[in-house]
Every structure is written in C-alpha cells, then in structure tokens.
UniProtKB/Swiss-Prot annotation:
The active site is at residue 391. GO terms for biological process: Mo-molybdopterin cofactor biosynthetic process. This is Molybdenum cofactor sulfurase. GO terms for molecular function: lyase activity; molybdenum cofactor sulfurtransferase activity; molybdenum ion binding; pyridoxal phosphate binding. The modification N6-(pyridoxal phosphate)lysine is found at residue 228. Keywords: Molybdenum cofactor biosynthesis, Pyridoxal phosphate, Transferase. Residues 648-812 form the MOSC domain. PROSITE patterns: MOSC (PS51340). It holds the Pfam family MOSC_N. It is an enzyme of class 2 (transferase). Its EC number is 2.8.1.9. It catalyses: Mo-molybdopterin + L-cysteine + AH2 = thio-Mo-molybdopterin + L-alanine + A + H2O.
Length: 813
C-alpha cells in the first residue's frame, strides 16, 4: 500500500543538513547518509581499537568479530538463512559481478552467457569472457524459459551457462520478474543443463525489500552496493547461494587471506581455505572499517525508517506523483512537454515501477531540448539529477530506438556521454533521470515539477511562422535526389517520399568513401576508370549497411555483392587505433583517410577496375588532414540579372540582397567530404533540356541528367524568368521545403561528364556542346554548387534538416 511517510519531513532537516537549498534527485546513483550514522561511526572509531583482521592481537580479533556480526546482519537484512547463503564483501556491485565472471571463465570449455537488454554496463561486460553471448529482451527470455529456444548458440560444447539481469533497471526504474531464477533452475533440471543466475539487485534494494527466505526461488548470485541503500559506506556484497557456490571455487587466482599455505620455491602448490565460501573469495585485507560502518548503517537506517517495506511505500507514493506530474505537463498548444520512458504505475500493481523516472523534454514545436541544456539549468537552480546513457546501453538504445549502426555512427561523429552534443540526425542520444530515495519528500517532487513547468513549458502559443519561413512558391520542385556514397562510383537514387538527412557536409552518406590507388595514393575517378560508374550502391538502413554490386560484365571469382557498415567501426580499418592513416590526394587536397583491411572488399574493387586499390573512408567531423572545405565561389558570368517578373517574384521570397564576395558569409569555411568543390550540387532540368536541344542540332547523343552527377535535380511546371534555362546562374538562395540553401557558384566541368553512367562508355557529348555554349574565361560550367544554411528556429523540423523528392522550391535572387 502506497503511503507517504510524514515523519521524514520532521527529521530531514536535522539528519540531512547537506540538503539545505538543494533538491537531490539522484538516489539511483547514491542515496544520502544521515548525520546519526556518521556520528555513530565516528564515535565507534574513536572509542575502539581495531587491527588488521589477519592478525591475532586482541584489536584484530575485535575486527574479525565485528566483521562476522555484520555479515550475519546483512543476511538477516535480506531474510537469507546463513545455512543457505554466504556473503562475500566486495568494493561494489561491479566487483561482485567480476568475481563471478572470474570463476566462470576458468571453466574448461568456457561458459555461455545471456543478459537482459536492461542490464547495467557492468553486466554487459561479462560477455567479453564468454565463449558465446546474447542480449535478450523480455520476449526472448520467455521463449528461452518456455523451452522453445536456447539461451545462446552453443558452438563450443560448453556445459555451463550464466543468465544475468537487473531486478530493477537503473535507467527507468522498470522492475523485472524475481521469479526468473526459479524458472531457470527448473529449466536446467529438465534439460539436464547447468545454467546459473546472476541478479543485479543494486537499484531495487535501494528503496525496496529483497526477500531471499525461499532458497528454491533465490538467484544463485546476487550483487548489490550498500551506498545505494544507506549512502555510506562505499561497500558492496556478493550474496551466494551455497548450493551454487562450488563453481566460484574453481577460479585460479588467489589473494592474501584466501589460502592456508603456499609453496613457491622448487614447487608451485597452495591449499585454499575451505571452511566457508567467503574465506576463499575475499582477496587481501577486507575494508574492515567500511564493514563496521555498515553495521552502524543498518541499525541507524532501521531506527529512522523502520522497515524497507515502509520505504518502498513512501517512495512509490512520491514516484507516482512525479510520474503523473511530468506526464500532465503540456505546452499551450497541447503538445506534451515530457516524453517518458518509464513504464509507469498501474491501478492494480505498483510493483512494475521503481522510484526512478526517465524522460526527455520537447519544446512546443516538437523539437528535443538537449540533455546538456536541461542539466546545466538544473545545476544552476540546485537540482541534482543525472543525464546521458546512464551506463545502460541496451536500455537507452531500446528507449530511444537507436539502431546499433546509429550508435556506432554517433560515436564516430564524436558524440560521448557527458559531451556537449547529444542530438544527432534528429535523435536524442540520452535521457534525463530523476530518482527518489528514503529521505525524499513531497516538496522535492513539487519543486522539480515547478522547475520543469517554469523553464521548459511554453505557456503561450507561438506561431509556427515565427521565423519568417512562409514564402510564396515559384512553382519549382525537387524532381530527383541522388547521392554517391563512393566518390566517382554509381549513384543511389533516393526513393520518393523518403525524407533524406541534410548535413553540413551535404546530403547524408554522399561521397563519404573513395577508392585509393595502392601505388600512387591518388583517389580514383571515372576519368581514368569509367567502370566505376557501374559499381552501384544501395543504402540499407535496416541492417546499417552500404551494399555494392557491379552491373557490368562479370569477372571470374567476383562476388555478387559486398557490404560495409554505415557506422565508422574502427575495427574495419587497417589502423583501428587511428595512429596512422593513409595519405591521399583528392582534387588537389592532401587528406588522411582510414583504409579498410578486408581483402574481399578491396579485391572486389581491384578486380573490376583492374587496378590495385583499397576502399577508404573520410567521415564527417574530422580535423586537420581529416577535414576539407568547399572551394566553390561565384563566377564573373553570374552577375545580377533581373527582369521585372523576377523582381516581383523575389519580393515574395528572400528580402536580403546577395552578399558581396568579400563578406563573412561568402568567405565562411564550409565543410565537405570527398565532393570536388561543395557540399551539394544542383542541376536545373530546364538547363538540361536547353542543352539537349543544342546537342540535337548537331546529331549528337542527348545527355542524361545522371552524367552531371548532381545531388538535386530541380524542375518546374511553368517557364518563368525565375527558372528558365541557366537562370540558376543568378540565384542567390533557395528554400527547399522548410530549409534554406545558399548558392555558392557554378560548377566547372571536365570531360568526365562524357561517361555514360549506365554503360560506362565514353562519348564526346555533352562536353563539346557545353564548350560552345557555356564557356566563360576558357572554363566550361554547368550546374550550381550550394550548401545548407542552418536555422536557429526552435521548430522540430529544423533540428533534423531533410529534403525529399517533390519538395517545393522558392528562389531568392
């Protein structure tokens, strides 16, 4: 039954003076120690003489006696019979997990490992020592426990398994069934297998009881940290079910205090202690002062709060109020302010949700408020919370719908937990966590809700046109979108209705890879290797892969398809530690690109092009030789050209005059990847039509838009002065959909545009005709360079700029 403990309000000021002017909501990290505990501990230390428990003096024997008393108190705290359980003192829950892992990895055939997706990082890390491992969600666990599938794939004939999970998620407070250990034990008996259970009880026991009175239902191994319950001391425990303890004694390492005798000279032999499990597992001198503090902590905690059931009722009452309060916060336009990831509280059961709430905040336009912004303001106002990934990788990925390739991509882009950036590609990468403890009060909840309401809820309706985005369309639209993931190779036409991400470097995944000649270090291009046009890419977001096929004549032993991860996985490169990288040249720039070491990948390209080459990547976010900038600039032939119709049309689009060539905006360095001169290349369909009319007069082969390898083809339904052939020479800005783009200048052309992108055959057109009609100062131009202009709008759509086929286009002159 949920019940608020008013007594906490009466003693909190005296027992927790450190809370003055602070609202502490990070009890999942550690709860707070009471004044009474510290005074009692200090008095104990000042009144008694304690020696090292490995000695035989009276002071040492006193320490030993107090340690064993505390060990028994811990078992009683969890209703665990000392006949059935033993307590091993460790530094923290992570140390307990590692102790279990050390024993399991010593098994002759290794061990199989399954862990729940809500597991703390410390549980996830055990997989590195298992011969096979698997991350399971609720459904997968149920399938396994029902006998319909194995825990993990067993390719190593391992007979030992370990299943680990948290009793309560440290991320969002969700509680998992405590019935699983018994079901695992029953399943192991039926299958004549041997799978043990490891329960991470750290988050649960901070505010709720853990009852181990029924040994048949108890986990084999339970880990916890006492500072999460009492605030002090910094100590943990591994509670071992004695029937399962034999496997822990198979570990090879032994430390001081765990052996009866050791032989070093001439022979290597030792005799481990064997009277109890903990004697064999507690390496070195125990943190005996902390253990004595634990004895005091248990007593003081009971005197202040009564039972753990009372604390559970109190914190559940507060957590429900907090959850409902956050859920009810709405902006003036009725949009929710908080996106909550915790499961919440049902009317029939309060045992599915702990007093930990995970959420994020959105503004009234649906855009994410960054965790960094929220935490900074909270810190200034003296609210103590936690943000980020919370050391729960599976839980945060599930809550935020982050695919593995997205997480790896975010890492490659420089995103780190605790960093300044936590939104990438329109997705937030962390959460805000508030957690309650035994000494939390209703005033803490009310104060925090008021804080969120005051600073993150819009109480007046803000017009969607506040940024002056509404413009009159001039009847142009995006006809097609194409990216070229590998420089000079085939293009991937973006499907209609697919909103494609626009990055500072250009369209997502455009020209992020290249092929480098192993001898010269030069990036390959169609000028010398026209067959590159027939290497066709596909972006598979479901699998997180860039897939590549060759559509020309087949080569002996050539595989049909290869793929590389979209994420910048360091293990794929020749130098995974980025100590060295391959120096190359792209369009005259010296660059440092990371090369792939996979022979199948590199042989695929080398066979097709009949040249020794390697695939290399030049991902966004680099610096120094891993960073390039746009070179495009306005040409002399692109001076102002305005008719009356254009002047009228311009009045409804962009009001600012074109920037002079020496202005800051013109000279600003714009990042690019492996494109020749600019982030984005646009082609005007009416200009292609005009060009083909000229080619037809001489009987030449008409040009497809694909030979110009543009990212965007713009078309119009009406022929007006704003978008007649080559009118792009005089455009200053474009608004495509809701995003703004700045024109950077005309694109200079070479004879590579004569390569047919479907056959790889070379023709003289369209270069010959362009040389007659579009030559200025001995240079041939066709198409326009452009870049995206970031918006400072609070609107959701500007947090993740996109473009799609069919978008309307407005022109600024």
């Amino acid at each position: 039954m949920e019940e608020y403990n008013k007594a906490v309000e009466e003693f909190r000021k005296h027992e927790y003076p450190m809370l003055k002017d602070a609202v502490y909501l990070d009890h999942a990290g550690t709860t707070l120690y009471s004044k009474s505990l510290m005074e009692r501990y200090m008095g104990d230390m000042m009144s008694n003489l304690y020696g090292n428990p490995h000695s035989a003096s009276t002071s040492s024997q006193l320490s030993t006696s107090r340690i064993e008393n505390t060990r028994l108190n811990v078992l009683q705290f969890f209703n665990a019979d000392p006949e059935d359980f033993d307590v091993v003192f460790v530094a923290n829950a992570t140390a307990g997990i590692k102790l279990v892992m050390d024993a399991f990895r010593c098994q002759e055939d290794g061990f199989l490992y399954g862990y729940h997706q809500d597991s703390h990082t410390s549980l996830v890390g055990v997989r590195e020592d298992a011969v096979s491992s698997r991350c399971l969600d609720d459904d997968a666990v149920e399938c396994w426990l029902s006998g319909s599938e194995a825990l993990v794939r067993n390719e190593h004939n391992s007979e030992i398994g370990l299943f680990a999970y948290p009793a309560q998620s440290n991320l969002d407070g969700r509680r998992l069934p405590l019935s699983w250990p018994e079901r695992v034990r029953n399943l192991s008996y039926e299958a004549q297998a041997n799978t043990y259970t490891l329960l991470d009880a750290s988050a649960l026991v901070s505010t709720s009881p853990l009852d181990l009175s029924d040994v048949s239902k108890a986990p084999d191994f339970t880990v916890l940290s006492f500072y999460k319950i009492f605030g002090f001391p910094d100590l943990g425990a591994l509670i071992v079910r004695k029937d399962s303890g034999a496997i822990l004694q198979t570990r090879k390492y032994f430390g001081g205090g765990t052996v009866e005798v050791v032989v070093c000279l001439k022979e290597q032999w030792h005799a481990p202690k064997g009277q109890s499990l903990h004697e064999n597992l507690e390496d070195g001198t125990l943190p005996f002062h902390n253990i004595m503090a634990l004895e005091a902590a248990i007593d003081v905690h009971k005197s202040l709060y009564g039972s753990m059931e009372c604390i559970a009722n109190h914190t559940t009452f507060l957590a429900r109020k907090l959850y409902e309060g956050l859920k009810s916060l709405q902006h003036a336009n009725s949009e929710p302010a908080c996106i909550i990831y915790s499961p919440g509280f049902s009317e029939t059961s309060s045992n599915v949700q702990g007093p930990t709430i995970a959420f994020n905040v959105k503004n009234s336009f649906g855009a994410w408020v960054t965790n960094v912004e929220f935490e900074r303001l909270a810190s200034i106002k003296n609210y103590h919370i936690r943000t980020g990934g919370l050391c729960n990788p599976g839980g945060v990925a599930s809550a935020l719908e982050l695919q593995p390739w997205e997480t790896r991509r975010n890492f490659s882009a420089g995103l780190r937990c605790g960093g300044e950036t936590d939104i990438y590609a329109g997705k937030i990468t962390g959460v805000i966590r508030v957690s309650l403890g035994a000494m939390s009060t209703m005033s803490d909840v009310d104060s925090f809700l008021s804080f969120v309401n005051e600073f993150f809820v819009d109480h007046t309706v803000v017009s969607a046109d506040e940024d002056g985005e509404s413009q009159k369309s001039v009847d142009m639209y995006v006809e097609s979108l194409t990216i070229y993931p590998i420089k000079s190779c085939g293009g991937f036409e973006i499907p209609k209705e697919t909103a494609w991400e626009v990055r500072p470097e250009g369209l997502a995944w455009d020209r992020e890879w290249c092929l480098i000649h192993q001898g010269t270090g030069q990036a390959l291009s169609q000028k010398r290797y026209p067959r590159m046009a027939l290497i066709k890419p596909t972006i598979d977001f479901d699998l997180g892969l860039l897939k590549l096929r060759y559509q020309g004549s087949t080569f002996p032993t050539l595989v049909d398809e290869i793929s590389v991860s979209l994420s910048s996985d360091p293990s794929s490169y020749k130098n995974p530690n980025n100590i060295h990288s391959l120096s190359s040249r792209v369009c005259g720039d010296a660059i440092a690109a990371q090369t792939y070491f996979d022979h199948e990948i590199n042989d695929f390209f080398s066979k097709i092009l009949e040249a020794p080459c390697v695939l290399a990547r030049f991902p966004a976010g680099g610096s120094g030789p891993s960073l390039r900038h746009a070179k495009a600039h306005m040409q002399k032939h692109q001076g102002p050209k305005r008719s009356a119709a254009i002047e009228k049309s311009s009045a409804h689009s962009f009001h600012d005059p074109p920037t002079p060539p020496d202005s800051d905006s013109e000279n600003r360095k714009r990042p690019i990847l492996l494109s020749n001169e600019s982030p984005i290349l646009a082609i005007n369909r009416s200009s292609i039509n005009m060009l083909n009319e000229e080619i037809a007069k001489s009987g030449g082969k008409l040009a497809s838009a694909s030979v110009f390898r543009g990212n965007i083809v713009l078309a119009s339904t009406e022929l007006t002065d704003s978008h007649h052939p080559y009118s792009e020479d005089h455009w200053s800005t474009l608004q495509i959909g809701s995003e703004t783009y700045q024109m950077l200048g005309s694109c200079r052309r070479c004879h590579m545009i004569c390569v047919d992108q479907d056959t790889a055959e070379k023709n003289e057109e369209p270069f010959v005709t362009l040389a007659k009609t579009r030559r200025f100062e001995s240079k041939v131009f066709f198409g326009s360079h452009m870049c995206h202009v970031p918006s400072f709008s609070r609107h959701k759509k500007h947090q993740f700029p996109v473009i799609k086929v069919g978008d309307k286009v407005s022109i600024g002159l």
